[in-house]
């Protein structure tokens, strides 16, 4: 029978001939554009976490809901939960303290100070990949144990806050005094797609510590939070782990003392789990069958839980009192001699060979065992610098307690930004340098003050390009990941930002603005810098024939140099800023990808990014004053010329050299070079998504819309760190 007969017959019987195969016919299935073009520009990263994914709606106010919370009632419920052992996941020694501490630690421990991404501030442990990370085995059980409490308190407490608070309560209920707790972490409702977890395709692929210093990666192996507890690449060598430990904790902004305190404090309570071979453990939550309902790692070893639990494959209990705070970690570390052994699962660990059996069994009170340690625990004894700190903590338990309390607070709050974002009754009063503290406002300019300042700025002799450049340089350091940077504080005038190459032209305007501030005697330099941008944009729009008002919210303050951690602020120096046509290094990604990265850090959408780049170019705001991307003969006028000329087919573009970083736009008829451009310019004509937006702004009826959109995006960037306006 012919093919046509087959089709005819199936149609005759009421069956669609194209629906008879086994292909997945659901939305999103099949080969995607990224399968065909894996290097396609990730413009989609600018569309994350929209209201379309948020079930609470755009009017939901978490801070307002939190104010209704019975905070101490919640803590009381968490305390009770700690000792309410559940048969489906029995508690070690009748306490979930160690489990909840690990949950909080691993939620916060994804933070990287290099790019400010990761951390506990968004509740990302609920989603892939972190919910199925090899280092997060069994934390699905911790989150599920918390569900009745989350259900009870509803939206008055976010998952993100609850994870960290549960860790704090676990410590407190074990006899430890924490430094405090700041709430304010708002949940998101889908995975972060912008976090670069690394290029490795296989779990637990080893990375050299030197590589970590050059990339925004938080762990030494794909799928770990920090380092391999068995030593680098399962080496079993404590001393060789020191470099890896310093690299990973250093990437979180931790020094040696904080690192020692965190490792020891985190290993004072609880245990690891390796009752049997990890081959008995089933798929992670993302791969588990639907009937598992979001849980994973089901084990077929014995009962699979309690005494038979398998998590990391390591079977370590550090202290004699694993549910009560003590200094036993350091006492055992230095008191005994340690020999390498293997867990029942075959993982490398150490046992105190000369110790008596003093460690209680988690489920059988009649049993005892010898103290055990991870390979990386012994690093604190054998690395010379770590040893000095560890011996000091051994001899001064109070110093250890204080160091751990502060380091734990830093770990769990590092990605929350300034203290003004913290809410709740247990926020510490002390300002900490890593919070980028700011002084209290002493004066808020009146409307007349603002008018007078605008006149002074307009008459200062600074060009539109200079006014716009100085404001952008101040505000554009903001990072949406950890809420650092921004215009508030005027740290552009301080070290290290004042000396950054990218700011060389912008800071030339500072003496003029500082003089205006001095003469005003009231306004902050931070406000004046942003107001300079307002004046520049309004002048540029007026020159284009449009009378506009750029919104301005006063109230910024000026930070002092002693409130500015130079080393930590160095991390805000951009590798590239496509908005200013700046790129410092050519060995890191493509120029256009780095533009997307910068826009995502500034929480911009694709249209906002497009409008800002187009406007910055015609305003002549390139970092070095170059003409790259300045597709206009009327610089300083807020026109849509950038888009009109970029999309004009009269011009063809050719790279100036093999690097293909710079290009010339020549008239097709005369061959005359009309414009020059970078990849950050041409991407708006090359990438199909960005071109679609550029075509809107290049249209004959788009000038007013472009100016309106540019102003809205500009004001957004200027106010990104104005958490007091929320």
Swiss-Prot record:
Annotated site, Transition state stabilizer, chain positions: 102
Entry keywords, A to Z: Heme, Hydrogen peroxide, Iron, Metal-binding, Oxidoreductase, Peroxidase
Annotated region (Disordered), positions in chain: 1-33
Cross-link Tryptophyl-tyrosyl-methioninium (Tyr-Met) (with W-105): where in chain: 226-252
Catalyzed chemical reaction(s): H2O2 + AH2 = A + 2 H2O; 2 H2O2 = O2 + 2 H2O
Gene (UniProt): katG
Biological role stated in the UniProt entry: Bifunctional enzyme with both catalase and broad-spectrum peroxidase activity. Also displays NADH oxidase, INH lyase and isonicotinoyl-NAD synthase activities.
Protein name per Swiss-Prot or TrEMBL: Catalase-peroxidase
Subunit annotation: Homotetramer.
Keyword Lipid metabolism recorded: no
InterPro entries: Catalase_peroxidase, Haem_peroxidase, Haem_peroxidase_sf, Peroxidases_AS, Peroxidases_heam-ligand_BS
Entry EC number(s): 1.11.1.21
Names of the cofactor(s): heme b
HAMAP family xrefs: Catal_peroxid
Residues involved in heme b binding: 267
PROSITE patterns: PEROXIDASE_1, PEROXIDASE_2, PEROXIDASE_4
Post-translational modification: The N-terminus is blocked.
Covalent link location (Tryptophyl-tyrosyl-methioninium (Trp-Tyr) (with M-252)): 105-226
Active-site residues (renumbered): 106 (proton acceptor)
């Amino acid at each position: 029978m012919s093919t046509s007969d087959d089709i005819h017959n199936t149609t005759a019987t009421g069956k669609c001939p194209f629906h008879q195969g086994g292909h997945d016919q659901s939305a999103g299935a099949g080969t995607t554009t990224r399968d065909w073009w894996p290097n396609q520009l990730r413009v989609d990263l600018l569309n994350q976490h929209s209201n379309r994914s948020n079930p609470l709606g755009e009017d939901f106010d978490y801070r307002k809901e939190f104010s209704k919370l019975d905070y101490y009632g919640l803590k009381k419920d968490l305390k009770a939960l700690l000792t309410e052992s559940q048969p489906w996941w029995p508690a070690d020694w009748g306490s979930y303290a160690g489990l909840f501490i690990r949950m909080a630690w691993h939620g916060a421990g994804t933070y990287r100070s290099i790019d400010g991404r990761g951390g506990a501030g968004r509740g990302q442990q609920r989603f892939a990949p972190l919910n199925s990370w090899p280092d997060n085995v069994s934390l699905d059980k911790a989150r599920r144990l918390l569900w009745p409490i989350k259900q009870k308190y509803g939206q008055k407490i976010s998952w993100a806050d609850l994870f960290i608070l549960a860790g704090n309560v676990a410590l407190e209920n074990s006899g430890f005094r924490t430094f405090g707790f700041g709430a304010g972490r708002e949940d998101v409702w889908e995975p972060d797609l912008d976090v670069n977890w690394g290029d490795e395709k296989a779990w637990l692929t080893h990375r050299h510590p030197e590589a970590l210093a050059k990339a925004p990666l938080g762990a030494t192996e794909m799928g770990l939070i920090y380092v391999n507890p068995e030593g680098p690449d399962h080496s079993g060598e404590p001393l060789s782990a020191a470099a890896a430990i310093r690299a990973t904790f250093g990437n979180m902004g931790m020094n040696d003392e904080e690192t020692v305190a965190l490792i020891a404090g985190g290993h004072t309570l609880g245990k690891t789990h390796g009752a049997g071979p990890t081959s008995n453990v089933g798929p992670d939550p993302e791969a588990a069958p639907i009937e598992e309902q979001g849980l994973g790692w089901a084990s077929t070893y014995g009962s699979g839980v309690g005494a038979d639990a398998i998590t990391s494959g390591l079977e370590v209990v550090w202290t004699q009192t694993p549910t009560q705070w003590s200094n036993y970690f350091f006492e055992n570390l230095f008191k005994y001699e340690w020999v390498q052994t293997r867990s029942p699962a075959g993982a490398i660990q150490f046992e105190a060979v000369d110790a008596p059996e003093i460690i209680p069994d988690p489920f059988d009170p009649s049993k005892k065992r010898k103290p055990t340690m991870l390979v990386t625990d012994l690093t604190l004894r054998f690395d010379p610098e770590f040893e000095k700190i560890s011996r000091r903590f051994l001899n001064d338990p109070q110093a250890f307690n204080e160091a751990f309390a502060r380091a734990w607070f830093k770990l769990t709050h590092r990605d929350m930004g300034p203290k003004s974002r913290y809410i709740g009754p247990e926020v510490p009063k002390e300002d900490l340098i890593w919070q980028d503290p700011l002084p209290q406002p002493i004066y808020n300019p009146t409307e007349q003050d603002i008018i007078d300042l605008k006149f002074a700025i307009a008459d200062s002799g600074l060009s539109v390009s200079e006014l716009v450049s100085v404001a952008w340089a101040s505000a554009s350091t903001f990072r949406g990941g950890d809420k650092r940077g921004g215009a508030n504080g005027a740290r552009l005038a301080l070290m290290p930002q004042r000396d950054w190459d990218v700011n060389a032209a912008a800071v030339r305007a500072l003496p003029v603005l500082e003089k205006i501030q001095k003469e005003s005697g009231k306004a902050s330099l931070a406000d004046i810098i942003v107001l300079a941008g307002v004046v520049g944009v309004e002048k540029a729009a007026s020159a284009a024939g449009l009378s506009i008002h750029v919104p301005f919210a006063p109230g910024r303050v000026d930070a002092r140099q002693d409130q500015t951690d130079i080393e930590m602020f160095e991390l805000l120096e951009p590798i590239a800023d496509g908005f200013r046509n700046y790129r410092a290094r050519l060995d890191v990604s493509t120029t256009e990808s780095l533009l997307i990265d910068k826009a995502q850090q500034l929480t911009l959408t694709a249209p906002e990014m497009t409008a800002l780049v187009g406007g910055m170019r015609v305003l002549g705001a390139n970092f070095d004053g170059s003409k790259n991307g300045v597709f206009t003969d009327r610089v300083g006028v807020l026109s849509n010329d950038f888009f009109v000329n970029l999309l004009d087919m009269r011009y063809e573009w050719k790279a100036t050299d093999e690097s293909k970083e710079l290009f010339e736009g020549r008239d097709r008829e005369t061959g005359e070079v009309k414009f020059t451009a970078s990849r950050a310019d041409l991407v708006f004509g090359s990438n199909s998504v960005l071109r679609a937006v550029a075509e809107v702004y290049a249209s004959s009826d788009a000038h007013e819309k472009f100016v309106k959109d540019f102003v809205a995006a500009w004001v957004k960037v200027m106010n990104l760190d104005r958490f007091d306006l929320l």
